[in-house]
Amino acid sequence: MRPVAAFLLLAATCFAAEPDARISRDIPYTQPKNERQTLDVYAPAAGQNNPVILWIHGGGWKKGDKTGVQRKPRAFVEQGYVFVSTNYRFVPQVTIKEVMGDIAKAIRWAHDHASEYGGDPNSIIVMGHSAGAHLAALVCTDDRYLQAEGLSLKILKGCVPVDVSVYDIPKRLQESGATPPATFKEVFGEAAEMHRELSPVTHIAAGKHIPSFLILHVADRPETKAQSHWFAEKLREAGVAATVVAAEGKTHGTINSDLGVPGDKPTQALLEFLGKLR
């Protein structure tokens, strides 16, 4: 039986039970401790050198929480992954660049402490939904954030952004018309140069060790579909492996909440992608 099929069959019978996992909550990744700069770790009870998944929640860059992970920790721990879900500070209390700094610091913590939880510090997969997908894609392409933490993109083995429409902010604004949405103004400002700098597509280049991408989007959302395919095209032009999967019958919310659910097609695509990285 194929590994993914076996997982889905097993999950159907055992998801009701708690996984055999070690769970550590509210771990600070900066000092002094700030509630918005903490993370939770879900790790297999045994094993070493397991890949590490760092999950970034969504919420329009100004709300959300690391606890909103639904079935994901259970699903990935059962497959032998260390699952880390991180908080980060919000706009407008801090700038989007400071938010990116938080994400890089969370990755630094995962790298430094992975082995304590049976994880491989040099095999980190970054994932996120909505605003978290933008943050994931940006930290995996703009290497300056990890460099500020003394790291490089080499420690990242994969990136899975889930349903976001701002891989290329200037292009997105052109498609939306002359007036950008209010959220865009608050988060990205109004300067064209800042829009380019905060666009993951801007930082794509060959030879940077950008990790492989699996880009998930809701099939019926034209803006995320267009941006996903445009971003993937640019990644491939730079020699980066990129796969786009359209999730049929999903909403912006359910593509996230259903990840890890038995029989979910995006989950199956995700597990197959992860399997190729091991």
Language model features with spans:
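Sec-dependent N-terminal signal peptides
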Residues: P3-T13
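Alpha/beta-hydrolase superfamily serine-hydrolase fold, recognizing
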Residues: F15-R278
